[in-house]
Amino acid sequence: MKKIEAIVRAEKFPEVKAALEERGFYGMTVTDVKGRGQQGGMQIQFRGRTMEVTLLPKVKLEIVVKDDAVEEVIGLIVNSAFTGSPGDGKIFIIPVEDVVRIRTGERGDDSL
């Protein structure tokens, strides 16, 4: 099993979620986060003043999948989050040793 953590543009998250759900990937944890990568930040005008925004709003999506679904999920996220501009995000793939469903005690792949 692998945990896929994806940081994507907040405005692209609805497309990412729809793409995953369309292929049967429903279980996920979603967190509103702020961050930045190589793009740095951006300048905005607010009440006639220029302000530097160094941390941009993003969405962090966490989903645990069986090993044979990892590449499909990565492809769905990349295809739906892509704009081609700096700030599209990152995907991290992390090994998961075990999962326990609290309600039933099921473990491993059966608990997903």
Swiss-Prot record:
Source organism's superkingdom? Archaea
Reported impact of P86 to F/I: Does not confer the ability to bind 2-oxoglutarate
Q: InterPro entries from the xrefs?
A: N-reg_PII, N-reg_PII-like_a/b, N-reg_PII/ATP_PRibTrfase_C, N-reg_PII_CS
What does its activity-regulation comment describe? Binding of adenosine nucleotides results in distinct, cooperative behavior for ATP and ADP. GlnK2 is completely insensitive to 2-oxoglutarate at a low level of intracellular nitrogen.
What biological-process GO terms show up in the record? regulation of nitrogen utilization
Example GO CC term: the record gives:
cytosol
Cellular location of this protein? Cytoplasm
Positions bound to ATP: T29, Q38, Q39, V64, G87, D88, G89, K90, R101, I102, R103
Q: Which UniProt keywords apply?
A: ATP-binding, Cytoplasm, Nucleotide-binding
Task: Give the residues the record marks as binding ADP.
Answer: T29, Q38, Q39, V64, G87, D88, G89, K90
Q: Name one Pfam family in it.
A: P-II
Q: Name one GO molecular function term.
A: ATP binding
Member of which family? Answer: Belongs to the P(II) protein family.
Outline what the protein does. Involved in the regulation of nitrogen metabolism. Regulates the activity of its targets by protein-protein interaction in response to the nitrogen status of the cell. Regulates the activity of the ammonia channel Amt2 via direct interaction.
Subunit architecture? Homotrimer. Interacts and forms a complex with Amt2.
Protein name (record): Nitrogen regulatory protein GlnK2
According to its UniProt entry, this protein's organism is: Archaeoglobus fulgidus (strain ATCC 49558 / DSM 4304 / JCM 9628 / NBRC 100126 / VC-16)
Its taxonomic path starts at:
Archaea, Methanobacteriati, Methanobacteriota, Archaeoglobi, Archaeoglobales
Q: Which gene encodes it?
A: glnK2
